[in-house]
Amino acid sequence: MGPRARPALFFLILLRTVAAQGRPPRSHSLRYLFMGASERDHGLPLFEALGYVDDELFVAYNHESRRAESRAQWVLGEAHSQLWLQLSQSLKGWDHMFIVDFWTIMDNHNHSKESHTLQVILGCEVQEDNSTRGFWKYGYDGQDHLEFCPETLDWRAAESRALTTKLEWEVNKIRAKQNRAYLERDCPEQLQWLLELGRGVLDQQVPPLVKVTHHVASAVTTLRCQALNFYPQNITMRWLKDRKPMDVKDAESKDVLPSGDGTYQSWEALAVPPGEEQRYTCQVEHPGLDQPLTATWEPSLSNTLVTGVISGIAVCVIIFFIGILFRILRKRQASRGAMGDYVLGECE
């Protein structure tokens, strides 16, 4: 596998894990994204970490600085607190663990000369009823590789080439118990602390702006439902036909993406038969909405005017040609009548 740039790695992890695994309304999450490269010729350090609370970046760390740096205003005053120091120590420990794991995986693949990448996502989710779910996953060279199972203290291999590492790690029961303790105890406690710090910021809810647009290309009519400027990012979008839910395979969806201003955006497209656009409705659910929001495509006034003008011109043209045809027929009839009178006069 060739070198990968920093943005490609980041979005690989973010889109395949955070965006793909949307959270239920009123849940909260703490996620750490680790990434690194065996060679330094493509913009990635040996280890880099990003921490997110409810999709909000709050901390960054890399192998060169070995320092946790705040990335959100609501944690700036915590740089010298005991909990922040504990977080910094955890990141330093993960730095060392990541590098050891990286070399282990490369050795088990007999990879030593080429440039390779390792990605890790770990963290927890806390639901409204205080139930928790932990996750700890590894990706190697951009592909799912290993996943930790806290219930059984073992590892699940996502591909056959991960089996050697799986068996090697499962021998170390102490590490497995430490992983489970973090996911089930330390991570939820850390999340609660961060939620308290971010109160008023992390608990804000911005409802989406929803609109449906109409596109025609290559004789295919497509309706696109756009949800813009919403927060948090967990959102549900679906198409209804005659007010009834449709099969999701009929629609083309876009991952939830950041808008660049702290909010998110997404869209869902559907190909429809021409002339039946009004039978389709886009339904959107979001924590910022009291009830599901629906939207349909409404032809713009300009389109209506253009259609009306074209129709009017067509009618006028038809009437004009009918008038000309009528006058021609009348002239022909008049000419035939005059000719008949002339012939009769000759006979007399």
Swiss-Prot record:
UniProt-annotated glycosylation sites, renumbered to this chain: N110, N130, N234
Domain Ig-like C1-type: 207-296
Extracellular side: 23-306
Signal peptide: 1-22
InterPro entries linked: Ig-like_dom, Ig-like_dom_sf, Ig-like_fold, Ig/MHC_CS, Ig_C1-set, MHC_class-I_related, MHC_I-like_Ag-recog, MHC_I-like_Ag-recog_sf
Highest taxon of the lineage: Eukaryota
Keywords recorded for this protein, A-Z: Cell membrane, Disulfide bond, Glycoprotein, Ion transport, Iron, Iron transport, Membrane, Signal, Transmembrane, Transmembrane helix, Transport
Region annotation Alpha-1: where it falls in the sequence: 23-114
Subcellular localization: Cell membrane
Residue numbers on the Cytoplasmic membrane side: 331-348
Disulfide bonds: C124-C187, C225-C282
Gene Ontology MF terms: transferrin receptor binding
Region ranges (Alpha-2): 115-205
Transmembrane segments: 307-330
Quaternary structure, from the entry: Binds TFR through the extracellular domain in a pH-dependent manner.
Family: Belongs to the MHC class I family.
Protein name, entry field: Hereditary hemochromatosis protein homolog
Protein's organism: Ceratotherium simum
Gene from which the chain derives: HFE
